[in-house]
């Protein structure tokens, strides 16, 4: 099984042959909104700082995110990554599900597991955090997304 790991948590042991995108170590440029990924070079961002990640993500069977919560929401680094994943989708939208969604560019996307850590101001804030992530991956045409606190990963020993 090919796995890609996206992490902003330092305490996770990840096997050596897994592609790792360390959001704490890698400087990722914000999306410029230039639309090059849709018009000039379809499917390819004008910035090249994530080319290796894009390839690994699209070739993976599973993408595992180890993330932190910041002020009851995802970090700015993770939000930037989500924004920069738009080249994986077509500029056209569909109303097939009763809501506007970009069409997939590729036939297959990896399953996703998200393990998060951080304190929340309330249980409803934690629930909203999980719902936001579920919606992101739904919009990304991810067929299977699991979202759990980091303790869920440590307890179930997910095979990477």
Identify the function of each model-found stretch.
Residues 49-52, 98-102:
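A generic local structural motif
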Residues 1-63, 67-90, 138, 155-158:
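N-terminal beta1-alpha1-beta2 submodule of the flavodoxin-like/Rossmannoid cofactor-binding fold
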Residues 121-160:
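Glycine-rich phosphate/pyrophosphate-binding loop and the adjoining helix
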Residues 69-71, 118-123:
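Short histidine/acidic/glycine/proline-rich micro-motifs that form metal-
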Residues 85-100, 141-147:
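Short, acidic/small-residue loops that bind anionic groups at enzyme active sites
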Residues 6-10, 117-120, 150-152:
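Structural motif
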Residues 102-110:
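Short, conserved loop/helix-junction motifs that constitute active-site signature segments
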